[in-house]
Amino acid sequence: MLLEVEKINTFYGLSHILFDVSLNIDKGEVVVLLGRNGAGKTTTLLSIMGLNAPKTGAIRYQGQEVMGLASYKIARMGIGFVPEDRLIFPDLTVYANLDVGRKSLNGRKSKWTFDRIYKLFPVLKDFSDKPGGDLSGGQRQMLTIARTLMGDPDLLLLDEPTEGLAPLIVKMLADFIQVIKQEGMTVLLCEQNLKFALKHADRAYIVDNGIIKYQGTIAELNQNTEIKKKYLAV
């Protein structure tokens, strides 16, 4: 098992957000965490990444306990996080933004080179000398993902990657997920675009009010109209 999340309880101040949340991901899987706005999807990713550490429970990555570690240490272990708000350095060029991701390796070699990134996201090559702040929302999303890849993660956490993007950009992100899936990269995806999620994931969890209400394969979820209607408003 690549990632094991076991009965974590996460709080924002005194507010209890996640209740005994458990999930697991095998190497090479694409797993989607579904749920309405405010259900606890993003908090789950923040908990895994150490950005909002749970009070109780356990999080193991490749068999090692990571709960309580600083987020940069978790990243160095091989977990990459792409947040929903597409954080980039707007005053740095696209190239320099990517270089920030590469420098996080601390001298280790990455299978993700500039050439490979530019092949995957050609628009970043076209704008490599432009400030990141000049990019559109979709281009910033590509840059955020690409910069994370430069750190050579084995597990990629994607938080609402299609939110607010044009259909053409969503198609490019779909192609990207297929590429990294074929290469055996593991992905945990939080997504409200149900059509996108069901097309590209292997398994799904549904979270509602901070509680995991369902888990199963995509085929099983597709057949379960009651669950989709109850928790996903389908």
Named regions from a protein language model:
Residues G57-V66, M77, S110-F114:
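Conserved ABC transporter NBD signature motif
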Residues P131-L135:
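Conserved ABC ATPase signature
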Residues L34-R36:
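The feature captures the beta-strand-to-loop junction immediately N-terminal to the Walker
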Residues M49:
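Helix-to-loop junction immediately C-terminal to a conserved catalytic motif
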